[in-house]
């Protein structure tokens, strides 16, 4: 499954430099979602093939962003 991983405050991880092979998103996706690939889409990191059990934005039980 694919999606937006969440920071500890319930917010998506921001990024700049839209597109593929974004170093920030690759790092976030590896560390927070167990994914080997991520990119910057709509100024937030999006991860593909996330690890099972990873909580993603929009999952049941996730609350609003507490920025």
Swiss-Prot record:
Keyword Disulfide bond: yes
Pfam families referenced in this protein's UniProt entry, alphabetically: Toxin_3
UniProtKB keywords: Disulfide bond, Ion channel impairing toxin, Neurotoxin, Secreted, Toxin, Voltage-gated sodium channel impairing toxin
Disulfide linkage: 11-65, 15-40, 25-45, 29-47
Record-linked InterPro entries: LCN-type_CS_alpha_beta_dom (IPR044062), Scorpion_toxin-like_sf (IPR036574), Scorpion_toxinL/defensin (IPR002061)
Molecular functions (GO terms): sodium channel inhibitor activity; toxin activity
The LCN-type CS-alpha/beta domain, residue ranges: 1-66
Principal localisation: secreted
Subcellular location: Secreted
Tissue expression as described in the entry: Expressed by the venom gland.
GO cellular component: extracellular region
Homology family: Belongs to the long (4 C-C) scorpion toxin superfamily. Sodium channel inhibitor family. Beta subfamily.
Free-text note regarding domains: Has the structural arrangement of an alpha-helix connected to antiparallel beta-sheets by disulfide bonds (CS-alpha/beta).
Role of this protein: Alpha toxins bind voltage-independently at site-3 of sodium channels (Nav) and inhibit the inactivation of the activated channels, thereby blocking neuronal transmission. This toxin binds, in vitro, to sodium channels and inhibits the inactivation of the activated channels. Seems not toxic to mice, crickets and sweet-water shrimps.
Name of the protein in question: Alpha-toxin Cn12
Organism: Centruroides noxius (Mexican scorpion)
């Amino acid at each position: 499954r694919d999606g937006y991983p969440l920071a500890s405050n319930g917010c998506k991880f921001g990024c700049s430099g839209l597109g593929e092979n974004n170093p920030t998103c690759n790092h976030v996706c590896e560390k927070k979602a167990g994914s080997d690939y991520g990119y910057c889409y709509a100024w937030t990191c999006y991860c593909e093939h996330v690890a099972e059990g990873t909580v993603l934005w929009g999952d049941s039980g996730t609350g609003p962003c507490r920025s």
